[in-house]
């Protein structure tokens, strides 16, 4: 029996870094939401006791560096699973883009193998396992919209924002998340109002949400990568209601409610940026069905 699982991308509507922890991680407070740009994960049982990664994307590692591989290995080791698995990954989410593509692939693998191998784990249990793989994996196990705290693994679900378009643009550069965090001086920069964002979402106040978007990591990435700053400026100029970098970058997203304006922004960005997507926010959390 083969199993297909969707692995949607995420954006950060608000991302704050509070301080560096004794364990080397950073304490964060974020509002994240899934969007309907998704990788496609196909899980194919194997006769031998191996884990294989299959992908046509040359940027996807096919060994232990791949987070989906790590997810499968974690379940095999934890529950003494002797069956092998091939994980076919069709990438639609740009790689190393600040959209949690790798983390979402891992989360989809956890959810899918939980079903395929009849493990009977809850989403909470899968999210706890996911935290061992990466900071964004726990959120990606649940999906929907949530506050993430700790190093990103403590998840509190909240309602989805009001319906709107999300336009994404990724320049053809890579950004090292570790390097961005290394260069972040949390005591010397302005911090976004994460609680205000949460309140605005509960009120379904689109205008307030647009005013409150914020990402503390922009302080590092925009200075080092002028291409990202340029996309932000152009997206604003083309008429997006709010513009923000997602994660550590380099992807920039804009929020917009009107179809005509969306088309104008999309066409304008396509003039100088190869990877541009127009998507919607996914309001629903994942289920175990």
Curated annotation (Swiss-Prot):
Spell out the InterPro entries in the cross-references: GHMP_kinase_C_dom, GHMP_kinase_C_sf, GHMP_kinase_N_dom, IspE, Ribosomal_Su5_D2-typ_SF, Ribsml_uS5_D2-typ_fold_subgr
The biological process GO terms on file are: isopentenyl diphosphate biosynthetic process, methylerythritol 4-phosphate pathway; terpenoid biosynthetic process
- What are the positions of the active site? 10, 136
Domain of life where this protein originates = Bacteria
Q: Which GO terms describe its molecular function?
A: 4-(cytidine 5'-diphospho)-2-C-methyl-D-erythritol kinase activity; ATP binding
Any one Pfam family here would be: GHMP_kinases_N
Q: Which reaction does it catalyse?
A: 4-CDP-2-C-methyl-D-erythritol + ATP = 4-CDP-2-C-methyl-D-erythritol 2-phosphate + ADP + H(+)
Q: Which SUPFAM superfamilies match?
A: GHMP Kinase, C-terminal domain, Ribosomal protein S5 domain 2-like
Q: Please provide the record's keywords in A-Z order.
A: ATP-binding, Isoprene biosynthesis, Kinase, Nucleotide-binding, Transferase
Instruction: State where ATP binds.
Output: 94-104
The pathway is:
Isoprenoid biosynthesis; isopentenyl diphosphate biosynthesis via DXP pathway; isopentenyl diphosphate from 1-deoxy-D-xylulose 5-phosphate: step 3/6
Q: What is its EC number?
A: 2.7.1.148
- What's the top EC group for this one? transferase
What job does this protein perform?
Catalyzes the phosphorylation of the position 2 hydroxy group of 4-diphosphocytidyl-2C-methyl-D-erythritol.
Annotated family: Belongs to the GHMP kinase family. IspE subfamily.
- The entry's protein name is 4-diphosphocytidyl-2-C-methyl-D-erythritol kinase
Gene from which this protein is expressed: ispE
């Amino acid at each position: 029996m083969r199993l297909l699982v969707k692995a949607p991308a995420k954006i950060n509507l608000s991302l704050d870094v509070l301080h560096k922890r004794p364990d080397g991680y950073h304490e964060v407070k974020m509002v994240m939401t899934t969007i309907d740009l998704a990788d496609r994960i196909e899980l194919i049982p194997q006769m031998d006791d191996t884990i294989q990664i299959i992908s046509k994307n040359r940027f996807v590692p096919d060994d232990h560096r791949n987070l989906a591989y790590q997810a499968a290995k974690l379940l095999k080791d934890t529950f003494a699973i002797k069956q092998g698995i091939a994980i076919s990954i069709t990438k639609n989410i740009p790689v190393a883009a600040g959209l949690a593509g790798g983390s979402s692939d891992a989360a989809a693998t956890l959810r899918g193998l939980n079903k395929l191998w009849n493990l009977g784990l809850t989403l909470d249990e899968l999210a706890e396992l996911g935290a061992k793989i990466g900071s964004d994996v726990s959120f990606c196990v649940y999906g929907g919209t949530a506050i993430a705290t700790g190093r990103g693994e403590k998840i509190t679900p909240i309602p989805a924002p009001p319906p709107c378009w999300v336009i994404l643009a990724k320049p053809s550069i890579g950004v090292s998340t570790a390097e961005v965090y290394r260069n972040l001086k949390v005591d010397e920069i302005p911090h976004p109002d994460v609680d205000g964002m949460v309140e605005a979402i509960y009120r379904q106040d689109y205008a307030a949400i647009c005013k409150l978007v914020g990402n503390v990591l922009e302080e590092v990435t925009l200075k080092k990568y002028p291409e990202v700053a340029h996309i932000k400026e152009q997206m604003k100029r083309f008429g997006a209601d709010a513009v923000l970098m997602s994660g550590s970058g380099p992807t920039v997203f804009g929020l917009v409610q009107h179809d005509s304006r969306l088309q104008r922004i999309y066409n304008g960005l396509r003039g100088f940026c190869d990877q541009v997507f127009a998507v919607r926010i996914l309001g629903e959390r994942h289920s175990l069905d």
